[in-house]
């Protein structure tokens, strides 16, 4: 039994909210619920990550730990990317599917414990990783992302300094041989590594 957002089937009592927000210049609505990450607002880290991403129409994006969908869905709506969105949390995935429909966005959304069910390669892997699931999960998102990136593709994550940004940065440098801090704001770091 778990109420945590990184559980497969959170058992928290339902508490549906509707968020009306503007992301990347697009007006969007999102259903959220108890047992999912950041249910009352689009968290600051996700908003910062979106502002720092450089993506183009038709490119492929893998959103790891997508939650109810704000990252992948807003990128698909604003830029016409092909979004693939995965999460372990079935409640979050149900919401992400409903949110895709509500916002008239096409996306591929399915359950996967990190990359377990993912196939193929992508131009971009993005993540606002589930810090509370532990450093091991964050490091696995970083380490294995390389296997799912095209050459020249990139991994971009958001992480707070106090929640391990320096160690995430050094892990990204170990894996990719490079890591750029795209932005620092209010203790949040946007980190990007390119597969060379």
Task: Report the location of each language-model feature.
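A short glycine-rich, Lys/Arg-flanked "PGG" loop and its adjoining helix->strand segment in the class I
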Residues: 139-151
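Class I S-adenosylmethionine-dependent transferase superfamily signal
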Residues: 75, 144-145, 172
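Short conserved AdoMet
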Residues: 54, 150, 177
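Conserved beta-strand signature within the Rossmann-like core of class I S-adenosyl-L-methionine
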Residues: 152-159
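Core SAM-dependent methyltransferase catalytic element
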Residues: 184-196
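N-terminal auxiliary segments of SAM/dcSAM-dependent transferases
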Residues: 1-24, 34-39, 187
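Conserved SAM/SAH cofactor-binding pocket of Class I
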Residues: 44-127
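Conserved class I S-adenosyl-L-methionine
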Residues: 160-177
């Amino acid at each position: 039994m778990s109420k945590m957002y990184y559980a497969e089937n959170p058992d928290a009592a339902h508490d549906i909210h509707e968020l009306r927000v503007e992301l990347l210049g697009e007006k969007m609505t999102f259903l959220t619920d108890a047992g999912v990450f950041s249910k009352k607002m689009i968290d600051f880290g996700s908003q910062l990550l979106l502002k720092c991403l450089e993506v183009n129409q038709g490119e492929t994006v893998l959103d790891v730990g997508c939650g109810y969908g704000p990252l992948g869905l807003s990128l698909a709506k604003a830029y016409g990317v092909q979004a693939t969105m995965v999460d372990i949390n079935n409640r979050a995935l149900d919401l992400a599917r409903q949110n895709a429909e509500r916002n008239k966005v096409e996306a591929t959304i399915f359950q996967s414990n990190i990359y377990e069910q993912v196939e193929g390669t992508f131009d971009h892997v993005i993540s606002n990783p589930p810090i509370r699931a532990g450093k091991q999960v964050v490091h696995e998102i970083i380490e294995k992302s390389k296997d799912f990136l095209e050459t020249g593709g990139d991994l971009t994550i958001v992480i707070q300094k106090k929640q391990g940004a320096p160690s995430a940065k050094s892990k990204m440098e170990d894996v990719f041989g490079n890591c750029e801090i795209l932005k620092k704001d209010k203790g949040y770091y946007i980190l990007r590594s390119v597969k060379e």
